[in-house]
Amino acid sequence: METKQCPDMECDVVIAGCGVAGLYAALNLPTSTRVIMLSKGAVDECDSMLAQGGICVLPEGSDYDAFFEDTMHAGHYDNRRESVDIMIRSSRSVINDLLAMGVDFERKADGSLDFTREGAHSRPRIAFHADITGKEITTKLLQAVRKLDNVQILEHVAMTDILTGERDGATACLGVVAVPVDEDNSVRPADELANAAEGVHAGEPFKIHARHTLWATGGIGGVYDHSTNYPQLTGDACYIAQEHGIKMEHLDYVQIHPTGLFSPQPGRTFLISESCRGEGAILLNAAGERFTDELQPRDVVTAAIREQMKQDGTEHEWLSFAPVERDVVTGHFANIRARCLEDGRDILDEPIPVTPTQHYFMGGVWVDKDGRTSMPELYAAGETACNGVHGKNRLASNSLLEALVWGRRAAWHMRTGQSLAVEQAGEPALDGRHRALSADTLAIDDLARAAGTQAVEE
């Protein structure tokens, strides 16, 4: 029997990953750019969908120094200072762009954005949508991408390698090798392949030739027994980078979140958002006693919980919502409450068992301020990449912001060959009308319109 060969595919940009970094990059490319996006699982099975707490934003110019210091302090001052500066000064234009796409952040009575606070933040600066901020943002970005005729999404397709060749006298990335996979990451049967391109056969590797390649494959939680990540996130880009000698950085910088909902069973752990502690929830030991300051950086709180578990001889400690106003619990933390009710615990009336669990990868494939890796024509953004913004320990709610900032910067550099300018820290604050405040928002105005939206009014 003759074996069918999958035809090669061609595009201008191939994006491995459909989280916020990949989606936002696609939206910031011209509609004349042919884009293919790969999702290793279903398109909504990305860690961006799971982000609960919110997304940081510079609420006013006077907060710049404090925001910078909070990020550096959480990262043990091992952060790349240029990256921290870029992220903070890009934050308001990103938020305004999300608002233009219909992202529904919580607001005060006067119509201005409401901000919450989380651990290691010196003030409230986190925009949020209940306790499902990541889902709200990712869903709106995905809706915008699906309106684009120039973007094709292939679900249940994994990147297994990159294509390389000479370009401008150097070895460059010329695309990727991919293969359709099943939900357990095994090769998919031919009759079950969903959303495949015409001529691509299940189980057979195929090539996607592209001018530019963006890695946005997420983290590494799938290699851990207990993680808040989806199991298919197994650090694929890092393995491929190692095989090709692509520069990586800080592979030992792995964040353990203090409060995963305890379960003795292996698999994905449900995250209990840090914003719960930001709103007043407290940690208790087996004797019902508070034992630490809950608003310290994540690694510090994790260490305190582990030490208390050792003293108590337990596999978990307890998180109590007793100090939190009941309407905040039922409103802000409705999703968390519903999940805990599935385990027979109502956070309105009793504490819940929590334990540290793998959550985030600060290291990864080294990139510069424009998302460029050490290999020409290969970019990376989001948890896959290490731009140094988080240092040794990520500040709460900086992950979505970082992914969006570098997804956009990578797209801009692909498009123009130049770095995207950022606003000055002293610009006016976001107000109730959510004005567009920065030069880079204006610069992507045409891209937003191309995505079926319009920029926030100037």
Q: Where are the regions a protein language model picked out?
A:
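An anion/pyrophosphate-binding glycine-rich loop and adjacent beta-alpha core
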Residues: 43, 240, 246-352, 413-419, ...
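N-terminal Rossmann-like FAD-binding beta1-loop-alpha1 element of flavoenzymes
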Residues: 13-37
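Glycine- and aromatic-enriched mobile tails/lids
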Residues: 1-11, 20, 28, 42-44, ...
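Glycine-rich loop(s) and the adjacent beta-strand/alpha-helix scaffold that form part
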Residues: 212-266, 270, 398-406, 412
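Extreme N-terminal leader/targeting segments of oxidoreductases
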Residues: 1-13, 30-32, 188-193, 199
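Short hydrophobic core segments
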Residues: 14-16, 208-218, 380
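Conserved N-terminal glycine-rich FAD pyrophosphate-binding loop of Rossmann-like flavoproteins
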Residues: 41-72, 76, 255-258, 266-270
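Conserved redox-cofactor binding core of oxidoreductases
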Residues: 100-187, 203-204, 209, 216, ...
